[in-house]
Amino acid sequence: MQLQRLGAPLLKRLVGGCIRQSTAPIMPCVVVSGSGGFLTPVRTYMPLPNDQSDFSPYIEIDLPSESRIQSLHKSGLAAQEWVACEKVHGTNFGIYLINQGDHEVVRFAKRSGIMDPNENFFGYHILIDEFTAQIRILNDLLKQKYGLSRVGRLVLNGELFGAKYKHPLVPKSEKWCTLPNGKKFPIAGVQIQREPFPQYSPELHFFAFDIKYSVSGAEEDFVLLGYDEFVEFSSKVPNLLYARALVRGTLDECLAFDVENFMTPLPALLGLGNYPLEGNLAEGVVIRHVRRGDPAVEKHNVSTIIKLRCSSFMELKHPGKQKELKETFIDTVRSGALRRVRGNVTVISDSMLPQVEAAANDLLLNNVSDGRLSNVLSKIGREPLLSGEVSQVDVALMLAKDALKDFLKEVDSLVLNTTLAFRKLLITNVYFESKRLVEQKWKELMQEEAAAQSEAIPPLSPAAPTKGE
């Protein structure tokens, strides 16, 4: 909202009105900021409804301290399957479907509780029709899958995000949010985040990351869907943006994800692929056990969900924390994970990429093959390999360049017109795929080359006898 110069009479009316109506649903309290009589609006949230019996809080996610990671290794859970998904920077938001006997009601919650329908919480009302349809479809899918006649409470947890994308060619949102009481607010005035990155879209969006339900409606009967079930259901709900795996593997493979250089792919998924923002790093990733919530997993009494934040974001959010993060995670937890996975930095999969880009990524990585590696080795020759003149790293780089060269010859022009950020991602992916293949084959290749060299050298002939022998 743009600052305005307000005269004393208007100031008196505004401040007085704000004091008199401090519990009104959407009255913003106006306070003096700076000099010269300029005012800026400050959001005042209305009280939560007294009855919070239907509210089911979402847990705070732990940071990956060394002791937590050690506990997971000792329990045996670290060696099982985990997924790392993007951590979206927004505000916690829950969509509820509550069975009240003769009918079902849809309610909405922030982290602290279910909201009054007239609370202006970051403009979410603009998405209510879509949310209502999605939670009802999800309810029907659950009942069909599990043969249920009713579901007492269903909760779709996620993140409300967006309403900010500062690119010169991308206009601000022109949409307005209308509350049940008729009050209207522009989406362009919503400010979920203050940090300069990550930015996602000028429009408001929702990113789902968990589904839980209770047949009876009681809190103790809630069932949290495992990751695979979550994806199965979410993928069938129209227009639902949900957490997809960037990495799937052991805990160490997820911890080895290069969170420090991870650019958020969400703008491209939301149609802004041609308008990238420089340095638009993701906040980080959330890593969770694929069967989180399963009693067999939770019986170990250790955290089965953790979050990683990139140090650049941490410095913005909590100034002075970058050094602490480096000492408590990057130099300890992550370096330990990298050692255990032999230095293989985990690269983003194509699961978060738009269709054309995902196809291009697959096509390029298919070019990294055993046959191409053999061709590269034949060009190098045996002697440089055995002498160490050409190293394992050199071979990986040559393989990546060769794969990229042929890929560019045959690729569709659509790919050449993708964003610079995606083209950089392609180069990174082909290098790490080449590095992985060379590391996997290196010992065997060197043994074969050494054996071939031995066969190629003729055995020494017995020396001719000298005179007198």
UniProtKB/Swiss-Prot annotation:
SUPFAM superfamilies: DNA ligase/mRNA capping enzyme, catalytic domain. Its EC number is 6.5.1.3. This is RNA-editing ligase 1, mitochondrial. GO terms for cellular component: cytoplasm; kinetoplast; mitochondrial mRNA editing complex; mitochondrion. It holds the Pfam family RNA_ligase. NCBIfam families: RNA_lig_RNL2 (TIGR02307). Belongs to the RNA ligase 2 family. The active site is at 87 (n6-amp-lysine intermediate). It is found in: Mitochondrion. It catalyses: ATP + (ribonucleotide)n-3'-hydroxyl + 5'-phospho-(ribonucleotide)m = (ribonucleotide)n+m + AMP + diphosphate. Signal peptide: none annotated. Essential for RNA editing. RNA editing in kinetoplastid mitochondria inserts and deletes uridylates at multiple sites in pre-mRNAs as directed by guide RNAs. Keywords: ATP-binding, Ligase, Mitochondrion, mRNA processing, Nucleotide-binding, RNA-binding, Transit peptide. The lineage of its organism: Eukaryota, Discoba, Euglenozoa, Kinetoplastea, Metakinetoplastina. InterPro entries: RNA_lig_RNL2 (IPR012647), RNA_ligase_dom_REL/Rnl2 (IPR021122), Rnl1/2_C_sf (IPR041948). The keyword Magnesium does not apply. Residues 450-469 are annotated as: Disordered. It comes from Trypanosoma brucei brucei (strain 927/4 GUTat10.1). One of its GO terms (biological process) is mRNA processing. It is an enzyme of class 6 (ligase).
